């Protein structure tokens, strides 16, 4: 039974799609000058696959990958297990009840007929089963019943062999019959496959004409191609169901005396080549069938198999097309996603680099402005403090300068040398008192060089209040240099945050508005207090 499915799907001679479609499947009137639309038919060149894949494919089929085969195998196994569980749940209770019923019937028969032993009863039942397996009904008078091997019945049995249906209600019992059945099936099944192919081609022609008319009508109404294909498929299946399923089911219900469910069950099981054999047309020994009844049933099986083969082939083609289109769409989506990711990554890197450069430049400018403002404010404060000293006190500071020196390039303003010396009280003029405040402050601002060049003897002879003022200026200069170094390090680091930029800008704004930092104000107040005490 499974061989029929293999033939329908994998062997070209056995599939109902063998030859070129007749030209009537694509009439010129149906095209209206446009490209022909994919049509549902049984012919191989009129199938959906041939039209949707295009002539570039050349009819070549790709080999299925092992991963796909394993995945399908797993799905089939799961499907089989599910079906087995459902059938067991539905049929096992009935089987158990039948076992109990036959056991009770046998016990009751032996109780009513004491003269019959259990062994004799079992022998009688076994003979009845053998007769039934041989095709002889043990019910009623078997001598008056029709033979299972008359010409009509034998013809019907031969048809079930080459169609691979195999109902199983009758089977050859002799060795000669079994050997002939093997040879008959080997040569008959391929021959029947060719016949199915020819009938399928003719059915494709008939349905192709009908579907072309339907497509022409819908194309005039400007219906989309997808809707046309869906409607054509539905009409194709409905027409086949009416001709090959509904009408035969009604006939079998009337002749065989079956219910509607049993009739439809027999039709579907037969046309799918399953053939359980529990229901067989012409197999009721109590009905006198006409001689032409069984040959007519076999002819219906022939045409119905061709139709069902076309339906199954069409479903398989649609699945292949959908699978291929899905793979192509997934590939396109992956390509677009990769391209989009690359573009976004490049844009992100460029934006990050640009922002990093801008932030770094702003931080550098802010740090430079802050350093210059601090230096300017510190110089102003020192100059103001020195101006408050008397000429005698300033002469003492002038004595500390034993040699000429200048500020470092880092601390000097505009890299100018500081060559100005403080003069004594007798040499101090009005011009000397107010001249070059910047050079004076730069000398005292360079604490490192001042420490190296200062005269230790003069330092020891300085008064205590002057030493306090000197230490205050020195500590203040050291603190200022440390703050400037820390600010430059923070501004030059790669991981500087925008918070530092905000702080620098705020401090710059405060300095531009004339606000003096708190530490500078405190230091100035302390210097003023020391000077007042000294005076």
From Swiss-Prot:
Instruction: Give the positions of the site pH sensor.
Output: 148
**Subunit structure of this entry?**
Homodimer; disulfide-linked. Forms heterodimers with other 2-pore domain K(+) channel subunits, such as KCNK2, KCNK4 and KCNK18.
Q: Does the keyword Repeat apply?
A: no
Which GO terms of the molecular function aspect are on file? mechanosensitive potassium channel activity; metal ion binding; outward rectifier potassium channel activity; potassium ion leak channel activity
Q: What does this protein do?
A: K(+) channel that conducts voltage-dependent outward rectifying currents upon membrane depolarization. Voltage sensing is coupled to K(+) electrochemical gradient in an 'ion flux gating' mode where outward but not inward ion flow opens the gate. Converts to voltage-independent 'leak' conductance mode upon stimulation by various stimuli including mechanical membrane stretch, acidic pH, heat and lipids. Homo- and heterodimerizes to form functional channels with distinct regulatory and gating properties.
Q: Where is this region: Selectivity filter 1?
A: 164-169
Reactions this protein catalyses: K(+)(in) = K(+)(out); Rb(+)(in) = Rb(+)(out); Cs(+)(in) = Cs(+)(out)
Q: Does the keyword Glycoprotein apply?
A: no
Name the UniProt key words of this record, in alphabetical order.
Answer: Cell membrane, Disulfide bond, Ion channel, Ion transport, Membrane, Metal-binding, Potassium, Transmembrane, Transmembrane helix, Transport
Report the principal subcellular site.
membrane
Gene3D superfamilies referenced in this protein's UniProt entry, alphabetically: 1.10.287.70
Residues annotated as binding K(+) 1: 164-165, 273-274
Any one Gene Ontology cellular component term annotated for this protein: plasma membrane
Regions of compositional bias (Polar residues) in chain numbering: 525-535
The reported result of mutating residue 279 to Y is: No effect on extracellular pH sensing. Causes reduced inhibition induced by a pH shift from 7.2 to 8. Inverts pH-dependent gating, with channel conductance being inhibited by acidic pH and activated by basic pH
Compartment(s): Cell membrane
Residue ranges within the lipid bilayer that do not cross it: 151-177, 260-291
Source organism: Mus musculus (Mouse)
List where the protein spans the membrane: 69-89, 179-199, 231-251, 296-316
Residue numbers binding K(+) 2: 165-166, 274-275
Per the record, membrane topology reads:
Multi-pass membrane protein
Q: What happens when the gene is disrupted?
A: Double KCNK2 and KCNK10 knockout mice suffer from chronic cutaneous allodynia which can be partially reversed by treatment with topiramate, a drug used to treat chronic migrane.
Q: Please give the activity regulation comment for this entry.
A: Activated by stimuli such as mechanical stretch, acidic pH and polyunsaturated free fatty acids. Activated by a dihydroacridine analog, ML67-33. Inhibited by polycationic dye ruthenium red. Selectively activated by T2A3 (2-[(4-chloro-3-methylphenyl)amino] benzoic acid).
Q: What is this protein called?
A: Potassium channel subfamily K member 10
Consequence recorded when altering residue 148 to A: Decreased basal mean amplitude of channel current
Topological domain (Cytoplasmic) residues are 1-68, 200-230, 317-535
* Taxonomic placement: Eukaryota, Metazoa, Chordata, Craniata, Vertebrata
What residues bind K(+) 4, as annotated?
A: 164, 273
């Amino acid at each position: 039974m499974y061989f029929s499915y293999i033939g329908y799907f994998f062997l070209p001679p056995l599939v109902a799609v063998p030859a070129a479609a007749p030209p009537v499947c694509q009439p010129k009137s149906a095209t209206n000058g446009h490209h022909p639309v994919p049509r549902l038919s049984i012919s191989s060149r009129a199938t959906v696959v041939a039209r949707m894949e295009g002539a570039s494919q050349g009819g070549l089929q790709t080999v299925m990958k092992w991963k796909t085969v394993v995945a399908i195998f797993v799905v089939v196994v799961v499907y089989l297990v599910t079906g087995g569980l459902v059938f067991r749940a539905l049929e096992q209770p009935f089987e158990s009840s039948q076992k109990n019923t036959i056991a009770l019937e046998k016990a009751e028969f032996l109780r009513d007929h004491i003269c019959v032993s259990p062994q004799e009863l079992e022998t009688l039942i076994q003979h009845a089963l053998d007769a039934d397996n041989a095709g002889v009904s043990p019910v009623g008078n078997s001598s008056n019943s029709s033979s299972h091997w008359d010409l009509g019945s034998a013809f019907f049995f031969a048809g079930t062999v080459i169609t691979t249906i195999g109902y199983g209600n009758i089977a050859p019992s002799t060795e000669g019959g079994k050997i002939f059945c093997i040879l008959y099936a080997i040569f008959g099944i391929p021959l029947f496959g060719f016949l199915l192919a020819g009938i399928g081609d003719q059915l494709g022609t008939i349905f192709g004409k009908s579907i072309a008319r339907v497509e022409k009508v819908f194309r005039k109404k400007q219906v989309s191609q997808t809707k046309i294909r869906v409607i054509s498929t539905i009409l194709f299946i409905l027409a086949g169901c009416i001709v090959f399923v509904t009408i035969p089911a009604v006939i079998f219900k009337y002749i065989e005396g079956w219910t509607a469910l049993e009739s439809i069950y027999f039709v579907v099981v037969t046309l799918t080549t399953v053939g359980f054999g529990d229901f067989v047309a012409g197999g009721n020994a109590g009905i006198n069938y006409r001689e032409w009844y069984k040959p007519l049933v076999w002819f219906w099986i022939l045409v119905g198999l061709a139709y069902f083969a076309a339906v199954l082939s069409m479903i398989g083609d649609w699945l292949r097309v959908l699978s291929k289109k899905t793979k192509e769409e997934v590939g396109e989506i992956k390509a677009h996603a990769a391209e989009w990711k690359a573009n976004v990554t490049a844009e992100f890197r460029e934006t990050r680099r640009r922002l990093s450069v801008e932030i770094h430049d702003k931080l550098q400018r802010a740090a430079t402005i802050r350093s210059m403002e601090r230096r300017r404010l510190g110089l102003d404060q020192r100059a103001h403090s020195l101006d408050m000293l008397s000429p005698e006190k300033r002469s003492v500071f002038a004595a500390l300068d034993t040699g000429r020196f200048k500020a470092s390039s880092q601390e000097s303003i505009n890299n100018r040398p500081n060559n100005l010396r403080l003069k004594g009280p007798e040499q101090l003029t009005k011009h000397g008192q107010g001249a070059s405040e910047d050079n004076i402050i730069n000398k005292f601002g360079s604490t490192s060089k001042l420490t190296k060049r200062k005269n230790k003897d003069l330092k020891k002879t300085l008064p205590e209040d002057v030493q306090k003022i000197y230490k205050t200026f020195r500590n203040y200069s050291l603190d200022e240099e440390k703050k400037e170094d820390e600010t430059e390090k923070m501004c030059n680091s790669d991981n500087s945050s925008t918070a530092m930029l905000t702080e620098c800008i705020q401090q710059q704004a405060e300095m531009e508005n004339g606000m003096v930092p708190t530490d500078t104000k405190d230091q100035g107040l302390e210097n003023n207090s020391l000077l007042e005490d000294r005076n």
